Design a protein with these regions (language model features):
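ATP/NTP-dependent adenylation/nucleotidyl-transfer catalytic domains that generate, transfer
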Residues: 1-72, 76-296
Length: 296
């Protein structure tokens, strides 16, 4: 602010604000590289990090086996792939992976995948007893997005194989592994990806990952995220859906502490949340409410 006087002339004016289109493309899946070659390279790197992280935990705890509860969802598929890689790194037999099938879902598909990978299968059983008998490390398969939103929980003693993997990235990691796999594993992975219930990254999860990325990686506020999401998703996501995803993310980040299991960190988006339990999200909530009022 410059006061009048002292040779200063103030000339008030006004001009209309016009919305301008973004001059760059915005990806709806910021965790997934757009370039196919880079995507394959990144997938190999992330899978390798996951496997080496699990290898370190097995060696550190002196575990002779890995105990993984599995269903027919893509989180379980990815966790099985990581476990198989880990045993290869350790020079151990893949039978040291104890896959415990859970009730529900397509159990036959789970059994075929386990057979193709060469891992041991146990029916729904006493996991604590199995862990003691085989000196096995308890594992958990839920991805980062499910844990962040509270859709899944892990036992305190479990190691989260996918706890740093956003849900929108799970499918691409499995697809990259399917490209390099041989039969019959390739067929089983493609069957898992094409299953009717395999769309684990619907629009709501894609919006959650999108909002989280731009909040943590870029420090964007709700109004900016809304504009970016409009450009990224177009007609696939209404403004109300975007604001709903931001509100859910706000509740999860600020109103309850994140309960993530032990896991290896991936990427540079601070997905391994060390979120202060007394953090307040009032500014975010107020801006989201203001945006809702503007749109009504």
């Amino acid at each position: 602010f410059v006061p009048e006087g002292a040779g200063v002339r103030v000339a008030p004016f006004s001009m209309p604000l016009r919305p301008t289109a973004l001059s760059r493309a915005v990806s709806p899946h910021p965790f997934v590289p757009d370039d196919a070659a880079l995507r394959r390279k990144r997938a190999e790197l992330l899978l390798s990090i996951q496997a080496h992280g699990l290898r370190k935990r097995l060696l550190h705890t002196g575990s002779r086996a890995a105990l993984l509860p599995v269903t027919d969802d893509l989180d379980s598929v990815l966790a099985l792939l990581v476990c198989a890689r880990t045993m290869d790194l350790l020079g151990r037999a893949r039978h040291d992976v104890l896959a415990v099938t859970q009730p529900g879902g397509d159990r036959a598909r789970v059994l075929r995948l386990c057979k193709a990978l060469g891992v041991s299968v146990r029916p729904n059983a006493d996991r604590a007893g199995l862990a003691r008998t085989h000196a096995a490390l308890p594992l958990a398969a839920p991805d980062f997005t499910a844990l962040l939103l509270g859709e899944a929980v892990c036992a305190p003693e479990a190691y989260g194989v996918n706890a740093a993997v956003p849900r929108t990235l799970v499918r691409w990691l499995i697809a990259a592994e399917a490209e390099r796999a041989e039969e019959p594993l390739r067929a089983e992975l493609r069957a898992a990806l094409s299953a009717p219930d395999a769309d684990c990254a619907g629009i709501s999860c894609a919006l959650t990952d999108f909002c989280f990325y731009h909040l943590v990686r870029c420090g964007a506020h709700p109004r900016r995220i809304l504009r970016l999401a409009r450009a990224a998703f177009g007609d696939a996501a209404a403004d109300a859906d975007i604001l709903r995803a931001m509100a859910a993310l706000t509740r999860c980040l600020f109103r309850r502490p994140a309960a993530l299991p032990d896991h290896v960190a991936l990427g540079s988006s601070a997905q391994a949340l060390h979120w202060p339990p007394d953090a307040a999200g009032s500014l975010w909530g107020e801006e989201i409410d203001a945006l809702r009022r503007e749109l009504t």
